[in-house]
Amino acid sequence: MYIIMNDFNGDDFNGDDFHSKTQHLNKLFNLIKSNKEKEFMDYINQLTPDQIDINIRDENGNYMIFFAIIMNSSTILKKLIKYGARLDVFDTEGNSVMYYPIKFGYYEIIDVLIDYDSKIIGISLINIKDHKGSVPLFYAIKYRNKYALQQLLSKDANANYRNNDNVNALHMAVLKKDISMVKLVIKHIKNLNARTRQGSTALHYACNFQLYDITKLLLDNGADQNIIELELDFYPIFYSVIQNDINISKLLVDYGANPNHQDYEGNTILHYCVIYNHMEIFDYIMNNYVIRCRSSDLYIEDINSKADIPRDHIDPNVVNLDGLTVVHLMLYDYKEEYDNFLKKLIPYCNLNYQDNTGNTILHLIAENNIWNKFDNLLNVKKLNIFIRNNNGKTVLDMIQVRYREIFIDTIVKSYYNYLNKYDNGWLLQWQNECSGSNLSEISEKKCLELIRNDVVNNKISLPTKKNKKSITIINDEIVHFSTFTGSLIDTVSGFKYLTKKYPKAASLIIDNQEITSDLQNYYQSIGIQINISQNIVQFEIKWIYQKIFMPIEFENTMQQIILSNKYKYIIFPISIILSSGNHSNGLFYDLEKQVIERFEPHGSDYPNKFNYNPDLLDDILEKKFKIIMSSIYHKNINIRYLRPRDYLPKIGFQTIENTEININKNIGDPNGFCTLWTIWYLDYRLSYADYDPSKLTRNLINEIRVNNYSFRNIIRNYSKKITDLRDYYLNKINRNINDYLNNRLTVNNTRDILRIIVDDDATVI
């Protein structure tokens, strides 16, 4: 028995009709499964469409039309269509009727189906999606059926359709490594830079699979090289460089690849050229780009400044996750063949920037005993030879004793040349007398003697500018066991600490424990239960599954803060929640300058493999604040909104700290200090509010390195400031952090502690 009874509606015909239809269908299924085309046609021609329902499936769930297609019988197919066969059905594996003729190259069947499709209204066979998310175009590309591909495209098949992985026809054609198919498809693609779920474009695939002709075709049609995939933050050229694909690498360079792009480890293509010793590509890049730093003044070299460097320029000061510039890498594995490259790069390098082991480029030049090769370049560089690496060694320690006097001569010349760059801009009188136009007041010989004395006896190899603003990193009391948890009470205590320390700063901690109705409803819709034992106050901006929720009474509280005229700054925590985990950011709002900065503790981008869609978050925040502030001031307020990529380095504080986990992890350390890094940064941001944020961030990182501080120790030690205040508040209600974490606080407890926090006006130092 072939018939599935559930497909019948017994009310539509009497028992005799049902019996005869069953017999006819069984006979037809027997004939078609036996490939008896003539007998099938003879039998069905004796029947009228009313005598059979050819849309009934057999006992295995198969439709008759699929047997006609598989046996490549256009005659039977046409007959079944004439008898009312449905074409919008799928086989037991979820494939559409277009699948088998395309797979097996049954061109006549393809033509029959496409021709019939053009005559009907409803679901189009051309673009029908199967149960796996594939469309006929995908079948044609998968099985390299160019005839089907041409026919489908000529009938306006949607080449821009994306499956569940966001893969479109162009992606598939490139993955099949077939340029003829790519040429057919590319004419119909609206967005050549469409990205898959993993963030890859067709150009990524072409470079990854070393497809030169396809890469060139894509570039000629306008493919964008400046798009990253989401797994490794790779740009297309990264695949080519790492695989030492010289031809495609050169092609991408010729089409303007940006040599300063970084992946998630902070490496650029120049880093990878050195790491894998792909020096032919390195040489080609060096010869096709101008080298420059972020300032035309050779004495001012900025590491990770956010000042724009044109794409046709090499920035030699880009650092990776290990704190290494490309010159660091070359010097750690020094070869004489690097000399010509080093001579080009050194004039534009910050020779005093320390990597994660504390070594500067100058340390490595000294260690390799090649400083004399670059003596003429070092003469015009800022040279701090007294920076100590993690082993406590200075640059001078690495110079062989017999050469130290000669080396100091180079340092003296550098010092002298640096003085002459600026008139009367120095801290000491004799330095001003030795600078620029003032040199007539004192002999050059005398100046060199004074400088040598400063270097040898005072251990100073760089003059200090007058009125220089210096940043001091406070390395707090050593904490071996931190109880900071990153929980809401820690966040509240941290932001309260900041507003106590900086009276001109305000946060949105108010005496109201309510949760906004939209947040309550959203929590219910996604099955999140509010923990009333830990609900102190909703003062965070929440970014939950890429949906934003502002704090309770947000606009009203903002208005009160602004109209009070007591505050210059407002600080906000941002709580980020994804299915893969939680994260924290912060906002710094300068009310006088009308500038908002979003701080991401990991740097300019989201943490690796934690894409919370920062661009959308920034777009929404910028728009919301402009609307709210314009409403408060009753006029259009033009807020300057700085995204992390506008001022933060690729490798930020927490990313650097994470590199120390294997060598510096204590019991009690949380999985991440993102909340604490946000509080720590806002502390320094408020302390140095007049600083450019890019310069502040750069100097903070540099100061931590120069002082040989551990990033993890810095943040762990800082935690005590917050946990002490938190424990003080908890002690006021006779509770401790364990009570809080174990949900032992009552609703009255949380109300009491909120009032204590709100009423705490005492300042801290």
Curated annotation (Swiss-Prot):
InterPro entries: Ankyrin-DD_containing_protein (IPR052457), Ankyrin_rpt (IPR002110), Ankyrin_rpt-contain_sf (IPR036770). PROSITE patterns: ANK_REP_REGION, ANK_REPEAT. Signal peptide: none annotated. ANK repeats lie at residues 60-89, 93-122, 132-161, 165-194, 198-227, 232-261, 265-295, 322-353, 357-395. It holds the Pfam family Ank_2. Keywords: ANK repeat, Repeat. It comes from the Viruses. SUPFAM superfamilies: Ankyrin repeat. The keyword Protein biosynthesis does not apply. This is Putative ankyrin repeat protein L371. It comes from Acanthamoeba polyphaga mimivirus (APMV).
